[in-house]
A protein has these predicted regions:
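Short secondary-structure transition/capping motifs
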Residues: 35-36, 48, 66-70, 117, ...
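Generic structural signal for well-ordered secondary structure
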Residues: 39-40, 52-56, 71-74, 90, ...
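Single, function-defining residue in the core of a domain
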Residues: 1-15, 104, 108, 139-141, ...
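Active-site-proximal, Lys/Arg-enriched surface segment
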Residues: 63-139, 149-151, 249
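Structural motif
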Residues: 19-27, 119-125, 319-329
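Gly/serine-rich nucleotide phosphate-binding loop at the start of the catalytic core
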Residues: 1-70
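A generic secondary-structure signal
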Residues: 49, 80-84, 166-174
Length: 341
């Protein structure tokens, strides 16, 4: 592969960022060019393949020693996205909260440990990041993240829920993302404190229920999967798909009275997985089709995780310094965003 002789044109908006000095901007452009176009996304690989890098040491110092604020950089990234119609957020958009585990091999990397990887269905050695992600009909990009670091004296679930609440506070109080609806997976939707935190800002939410979640029906509490065996579903069209649907306003454990929707996709394809979905939302009066369509947007964060790991170096940082690793992940989000402009 021939060396990359110039910074990618998508890095030009960095010239207007106030969080970086002139020389820091050059390093950032080099690093972003490497994340986007180099085969190896480490400092060593970028220095070898991107000629403006000067040296691996210079990039390492940029990540670990130079004085710049990655949080300010991130806010400037989000401000830049609002300058373009195709990436400007709106009330009709959605904020997705989810986490991702990046498998690693080193034992001295920041926050590395054993985490359950939902995409693999097993516990792996790696780093765990909790993300907020914006999406709507025209665009999709990350908003911010927190790294979860496992400690023996802490409850893993509660600590990760706390990080998610911190993210929501930042988005609502500092950034001001106008999206009216939050989307969760079953793990995050299990935390009543997180749900209440979203509702405290007057926002809506949609998330799946675990099959063992307790629902009050006929004056008794039963599992939602047991409820599914009792009820009669009605066949309805949602876009180009057919679902068998049942929905009612019901008390759910930890969530209070919410709209419960049980949906089973109808298909003639024997190879297509056809699980029953148990969804809940505080959008009590929302049509079933709206709830199903809304929740389908959650998949876009999975695409971001996949693209970031395969093509943009999400899991390639070898820096052992915590601040340096955080800066790498912020620059990776910036790379993803600039490539969409």
């Amino acid at each position: 592969m021939l060396p990359i002789t110039n910074h990618l044109s998508c890095t030009e908006p960095l010239d207007e960022f106030e969080s970086l000095s002139y020389h820091q901007t050059l390093h950032a452009k080099t690093y972003i060019t490497g994340l986007a176009a180099a085969r190896s996304k480490t400092c060593k690989g970028i220095a070898r393949e991107v000629l403006p890098a000067n040296s691996e040491r210079a990039l390492n110092k940029f990540l670990t020693e130079y004085d710049w604020d990655e949080k300010q950089l991130n806010h400037e990234r989000l401000e830049e996205l609002q300058n373009h119609g195709e990436t400007r957020w709106s009330q009709d958009g959605y904020i997705i909260i989810d986490d991702s585990v990046t498998q690693r091999t080193g034992e001295e990397l920041p926050g590395v440990g054993r985490f359950y990887d939902h995409s693999e269905g097993e516990t792996v050695w790696g780093q765990n990041l909790v993300y907020a992600f914006y999406t709507d009909d025209k665009t999709a990009y990350p908003l911010t993240f927190r790294q979860y670091e496992k400690r023996d004296d802490e409850d893993e679930d509660e600590t990760k829920y706390k990080l998610a609440r911190e993210i929501i506070t930042e988005l609502e109080d500092e950034v001001g993302v106008p999206a009216d609806t939050y989307l969760f997976d079953a793990w995050f939707a299990h935390d009543s404190g997180l749900i209440k935190h979203v509702e405290s800002y007057g926002k809506d939410w949609v998330g799946p229920l675990r099959s063992n979640r307790q629902v009050t029906y006929d004056n008794e509490e039963i599992r939602v999967d047991a409820l599914e065996e009792r009820i009669d579903k009605t066949e309805r069209e949602v876009d180009d798909d057919t679902y068998k649907i049942w929905t009612q306003k019901r008390p759910v454990s930890k969530l209070g009275e919410v709209k419960v929707l049980i949906a089973e996709k109808v298909t003639d394809d024997e190879d297509e997985e056809n699980p029953v979905k148990y969804l809940a939302t505080n959008k009590i009066d929302a049509p079933s089709a709206h709830v199903i369509r809304t929740y389908s947007y959650r998949w876009r964060i999975e695409t971001f995780f996949e693209d970031s790991k395969q093509d943009l170096g999400l899991g390639d940082c070898e820096v052992r310094d915590g601040e340096g690793a955080s800066r790498h992940w912020h620059l990776q989000m910036l790379t993803y965003s600039l490539l969409r402009l």
